[in-house]
A protein has these predicted regions:
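Conserved active-site-proximal phosphate/metal-binding subdomains
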Residues: 214-244, 249-382
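Cationic, amphipathic, low-complexity segments that mediate targeting or membrane/lipid association
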Residues: 5-12
Length: 382
């Protein structure tokens, strides 16, 4: 019989093997895990990945109530809807959770590139008896653009806030620190991780190439494409703050491997998309269990993102494909094409984000999945 109560309250159960990790030993990493659990006030080193469009207050609360760190992906929200989502989550749980925003560099849309991209996709609109838009809009604001999102976070005071695509402005980081709100930023290579540390961020999320959804790369034109296992080892050896492993983690065995390499926690997204409390539609849920090939494409949104193989990969990402419009303008067009296709019963242009190990997905609700992960993690520990 596995005593989950003992397992949940003892960090050493997660890091049983003492081994050298180069510059930073596993002993020191064990202390980092203890620090992370203590500062976040959570029982387990298991995070729900913040997934814009899929995250819900209900799913976040379920994970947090089970001792992990729930999350809200708010990058696609306005300040008002972000506030509403946070308040709703706080009404469902008294436990800590994180909120996530995008920190991309906003750039001016190149009209020539945009028009070329619209024209390239025009035949695909026409096959669904639709016309593409004449203009593209910036549908996802950046946290860097103004302090509207910052003010919402300062008002609602979630336990932690994480960022994708870059680092917030210094004054924003300082305001969060002054409010006692912990900060996390995704890194895909050592240079990004060092920039994150230099900015005074509390935790680094090591996003491996296996991860579903958007790559957290700061520069959309450069990707080191490191596997999660390699990235975790690299960052734990060279960084002096807790590392959260993300990408391709679907079960407790994989989670425990990351912890044994020095990660202080693991973050899972794809594994939770199938939960009833996620916002995934029926087509997305069906695809998760039946379409197990994933591929990275920038055609959907304008930035590289990994998803289940669909029309974007087989019909759009061709050798003659022109340059895509800038993110998130490109995503405006992509969503409209998906909407047109859906009206005709075709879900092939959906952005069904998923990691490389999606074939290992299990039909489980969040509380049961957390418990199953813990059981599997302990079994590896002995």
């Amino acid at each position: 019989m596995i005593d989950l109560d003992i397992f949940r309250e003892n960090t050493e159960y997660y890091l049983p093997n003492l081994q050298c990790l180069g510059k930073v030993s596993i002993c020191k990493r064990s202390k980092y895990m203890s620090l992370l659990l203590e500062r976040l006030e959570i029982k387990h080193p298991i995070f729900l990945a913040p997934m814009a469009g899929v995250s819900t207050p209900e799913l976040a609360a379920e994970v947090s109530n089970q001792g992990g760190l729930g999350s809200l992906g708010l990058g696609a929200n306005t300040a008002e809807t972000a506030r509403s989502q946070i308040l709703k989550t706080q009404a469902l749980t008294e436990q800590p959770f994180q909120v996530n925003f995008f920190c991309h560099q906003s750039i001016e849309l190149d009209p020539t590139i945009a028009q070329t991209w619209i024209d390239f996709l025009r035949p695909h609109f026409e096959q669904y008896d639709a016309e593409p838009p004449t203009q593209l809009h910036c549908i996802y604001p950046s946290f860097l653009d103004n302090d509207d999102f910052l003010n919402v976070v300062l008002e609602t005071r979630p336990k932690a806030v994480s960022f994708h695509f870059g680092v917030p402005h210094p004054h924003q980081i300082q305001a969060l620190k002054d409010a006692g709100i912990l900060t996390m930023v995704s890194a895909t290579n050592l240079a990004e991780a060092r920039a994150i540390e230099a900015a005074g961020i509390d935790f680094i999320i090591a996003q491996g190439i296996e991860a579903g959804g958007h790559r957290g790369i700061f520069n959309e034109h450069f990707d080191s494409a490191l596997r999660t296992v390699d990235l975790v080892q690299l960052l734990t050896q060279h960084c002096q703050c807790p590392i959260i492993a993300a990408g391709g983690i679907m079960n407790g065995t994989q989670a425990q491997q990351m912890l044994s390499l020095g990660a202080s926690a693991v973050q899972l997204g794809t594994a939770f998309v199938q939960c009833k409390t996620s916002n995934a539609n029926d087509a997305y849920r069906h695809a998760l269990f039946h379409e197990h090939i994933t591929q990275i494409s920038a055609s959907i949104s304008g930035r590289p993102a990994r998803g289940l193989l669909g029309h974007w990969h087989t019909q759009i990402d061709l050798p003659n494909r022109p340059a895509v419009a800038a993110y998130p303008y490109c995503y405006d067009l992509g969503k409209q094409l998906h909407a047109a296709a859906t009206k005709q019963g075709d879900q092939g242009f959906g952005a069904f984000w998923a990691g490389t190990n999606v074939s290992q997905i299990r039909a489980m609700e969040a509380p049961d999945l957390i418990n199953q992960l813990l059981v599997e993690m302990q079994q590896v520990s002995y």
